[in-house]
Amino acid sequence: MGNPGNVVRRRMSGPERRRQLLDVGRATFAERGLDGTSMEEIASRAGVSKPVVYEHFGTKVALYREVVAEEMERLENVIADSISRGRSRARIERAVVGLLAYVEDHTDGFTILARDPVSNQGFATLLGNATGRVSHILGAAFSRAGLDESPAVLYSQALVGMVSQTAQWWLDERTSQGLDKETV
């Protein structure tokens, strides 16, 4: 019978350790930004030595880029899945709720994408792509209704901008305002 005071710790595999460092890095970058984060802090929070972090990523910027790439892919998938099927209005509503669900479920990732100037270019590109997709959806809906399609570009810019800004506001205010994503 083992001593209950002795805890046997299993050593993490390389992929498990990498995943842990990405998760710790994401949380730290969201809290402090790229410039305010050090590899020492990431190592300390992960309970490893600094050389272990460098072994997996080489540099702080490389770790940051990988975190940003994961979050961009995750958010792109949310948007793409939301607008891939259904009627125009339902597709856009699903995209809005999908974005808010992403903010709720991946707060650190959204904070990095939307607020850190280093990753903001990628977020701007993602919003530009979303605007293009929404423009096509609105243009097709306008055409089916016998309306001029040309305002679709303007309306899509307004809609995507409004939703993006609302998501950033909700990130800060959802708890104090008591607002869930369905209400927003």
Where are these regions (language model features)?
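Hydrophobic alpha-helical connector segments
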Residues: 66, 77-107, 155-159
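Short hydrophobic/aromatic patch on the recognition helix
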Residues: 47-57
